[in-house]
Amino acid sequence: MGACISKNSSARVSRSSALSASKQTVAASAPPGAAGDETSATGAAEEASRNSLARVDGTRASAAELERAPDGVCPDREEPGTANAEQGGVTEKKDTRETLAGMNSPKTLEAEAQEDDPKREAPNQDVPSEAPEGPKEKPGGDRKPAQKAILKQDDSHTEEEKLNAHLAYREKTPADFALIQDSLKANLVCSSLNEGEIDALAVAMQFFTFKKGDVVTKQGEPGSYFFIIHSGTFDVLVNDKRVNAMDKGKAFGEIALIHNTERSATVVASSTEGALWGVQRHTFRETLKQLSSRNFAENRQFLASVKFFEMLTEAQKNVITNALVVENFKPGQPIVKEGDAGDVLYILKSGKAKVSIGGREIRMLRKGDYFGERALLYKEPRSATITAEEFTVCVSIGRELLDRVLGNLQHVLFRNIMVEALQQSKVYELFQGDQLSKLIEAAVVKDYGADYVILDKENKTKGIRFFFVLEGELSVYAYTQNPATKEEERKLAATLKRGQAFGEEYVLNPTRPFNHYVKSVGPCKLALFTSSVLTATLGGEDIDETLDFNNKRAIIRKMYIFRYLSDHQMTMLIKAFKTVRYMSGEYIIKEGERGTRFFIIKAGEVAILKNNKRLRTLGRHDYFGERALLYDKPRTASVCANSAGVDLWVVDKSVFNEIIKGPMLAHLEERIRMQDTKVEFQDLQVVRVVGRGTFGTVKLVRHVPTDIRYALKCVSRRSVIALSQQQHIRLEREIMAENDHPFIIRLVRTFRDKEFLYFLTELVTGGELYDAIRKLGLLARSQAQFYLASIVLAIEYLHERNIAYRDLKPENILLDSQGYVKLIDFGCAKKMQGRAYTLVGTPHYMAPEVILGKGYTLTADTWAFGVCLYEFMCGPLPFGNDAEDQLEIFRDILTGKLVFPHYVTDQDAINLMKRLLCRLPEVRIGCSINGYKDIKEHAFFGDFDWDKLAGRGLPPPLAPKGETYAEDTEQSSFELDEDDTIVLEDEYDWDKDF
């Protein structure tokens, strides 16, 4: 509950029933109380190859790496294996999750993203001689009580104040820069940085001097500095016992660069004199943020200058910008060579390059110039050699990577042209999005030479009814009759260029003969809609019937009562409507009578009357009587025809109940009942406490007038202020108030008083998904499909509104009384505007780009899908499951190998996990321009019915028996002393919206 700030979400019980692991939720604002890393020098990070990290924001895998990567595989991954030694030798993994104390060292893992075909034969891989044995049976076990972290204010400034006494001025020499740069490059957190970023951080390093016995860091105190030893020796003490000694070039404290945590050891100067280079976390992350933001903005601007991409949408341009790779070229180094195969587009970011053909210089390229655009479309050899004249920096993207993040570029460009033309059409603007997509996909693309007669009225056999100009220019002539000669003549009606379309009149009148003459001016490319394509897409030749259907659907989708029906339920309901006509003055419904029908006005006007007094009028596409479908109650008003004739679409309650029934009907009744109830704080009666958290308690309350039960989250204003979480709480309320999805907890309203803020939400009684998967053991494919698909739909809803959830894990998902999921706890959520840089979430579920600090987008949530699916089907967590501290968790996420237990043999599931747990966010499945469509259409979901899930037509894996709530035996994890004098009234009215 509340913002994600260093709460210890739970002590997790392994599904092998005996072992647990602590998982903490982290944010920059407060210390999570996790172990530090003073005992690990930089050498520990040297094991990780720099090239194995996700390169973010223009500093990713080199072009060569991208070229070598097989289709569908993250460039920094090895080729995927299969589920056991006999099938290819993927290392097995134990199903264990131990506490932070006394764990084994983490295994080396490597995240992989496989090709679309998971059943393809993989190359052999080395198999450990003693592969760890997985569990013989499906694990299970009871959950241990959650362990709450002790929260306190962010006092990391204490270390900074102490270090100020040792701060000294030193102008860095070339040797100093070399020492710092080498150490930073070997550091885990910095290993993904480019040369410019390393240089900027080296400049930001401060110089500190110490004498023998001086304390640099103290065990148990919050730390915010990362250090590199310049000279002297320093001892490492744990519990006042010397465990290590460090000298020149060694580094320590790298976890402090990621987030605010307590030091795990004391470091003391042991030589007569010693000196350190140090950088504070805020300086480090702010430097990366500024460099990353500037780099993205520059690359985006360069991309905008490429006319080749001008027909792309802003979202598509952003996707390409994220995928751009930075390449450096020395003077005289060829960038491309004449005659070589070309498949990369280059944009000069700085420097200049010479273009030559056959050894003869043609021209000079400078900043902002680009070349190789045809290489993205056609497999043509390079027509010229381009050589760097001076040190030159380029950003580039290859055809293979572009296909993965955007799709076939030519197809995308043509699709954009068609979408824009259809959106401007008065005919097609009434079509549904899925209908337009089907039309576009079914379009036939053809090339025509110059002066070619494409269509003539006699060419009826072609069946062409509508076309777009994708490239080139053509003329359209209309046939008219000469009054004098009575002969037909052709008269120029229009000249069409790229992006323009023709044929609306033939779409509206499918049987009307084509009566135009169409001829190309020069070579051109057209996209054609034939009569058969239109018929197949519209479901028949009657376009009026299709538009009628679309109108009903658009109206019904806006109504709360019908908003989340499945497509099948929606279609059945619309087909059940009948048209009824009423004459002026005729009563349609009467006040006080039992309602059994729902009406939508097709044409005309009706008057709403109460006690024979007119309240208002309703017109075309307005509706009334919808609650009669759910409730057997008297009509509260009369409705009569107010125009000469009123045509209504009508559906009866009996028909509705045949279409909408069972869990969906019960869900609708509950949601409508909750929406109708006006709740006042004084009408709430506390029944019991159902949970406790960082900022207070969650209580089960009863609304006395209606007997409806709710959950009331009581947030201590004192705690919020003490932890500087005012903005987080405001944002949490704002996001929750906007959410309206069946798989997301519903906020009813908020209250406040002097001591507390209150969130009144629907009551969710089925317990946590975390507990459910422990009861079920390892999930079968159908069970994992159900839960992952439900989570995907909830997060997709948020992402459509540009909201990043940022703390996705089974503990933050509850089950309702039917066993369907409810996403809760929006304390970490953020409305995204550009990129985010804050380290927030639960370490085991964090995406690599969140840890690295160079900016992330909505893609971070998609990584968590992979972690959850792995947990569902494999048992342990994919990364850091056996880690001793958070630094090891982060190291495993950034550099570890993804391996699967021998008992996981579902190749579709393995493939999806690999593609979700891809360290390159732009290549991660679900993160390309296709979005969640790629996830939904993955082979793992090939036999899954998404529509039935939305309509509550699938049986949940676990049907709750009775009511289950979080244990309420623990005390609040944040307690202020009685004499605490925190002022409750802030300088600004931060809680005014409650």
Swiss-Prot record:
Result of altering C4S: Partial loss of myristoylation. Loss of palmitoylation. Partial loss of membrane localization
Recorded GO CC terms: apical plasma membrane; cAMP-dependent protein kinase complex; cytoplasm; plasma membrane
Comp. bias regions, Low complexity: 9-22, 33-46
Domain (Protein kinase): residue spans on this chain: 684-941
Location of region: Disordered: 1-162, 954-976
Record's subcellular location: Cytoplasm; Membrane
Signal sequence coordinates: none
Annotated 3',5'-cyclic GMP 2 binding sites: R616, G625, E626, A628, R635, T636
Active site residues of this protein: D807
Positions of the UniProt region annotated as cNMP-binding domain 4: 561-660
Binding residue positions for 3',5'-cyclic GMP 1: G253, E254, A256, R263, S264
Compositionally biased spans, kind Basic and acidic residues: 65-80, 133-162
Family per similarity comment: Belongs to the protein kinase superfamily. AGC Ser/Thr protein kinase family. cGMP subfamily.
Functional note: Serine/threonine protein kinase which acts as a downstream effector of the second messenger cGMP. Plays an essential role in tachyzoite invasion of and egress from host cells. During invasion of host cells, regulates the apico-basal flux of F-actin probably via Ca(2+)-mediated activation of CDPK1. In tachyzoites, required for microneme secretion. Required for tachyzoite gliding motility.
This protein's name: cGMP-dependent protein kinase
Lineage of the species this protein comes from: Eukaryota, Sar, Alveolata, Apicomplexa, Conoidasida
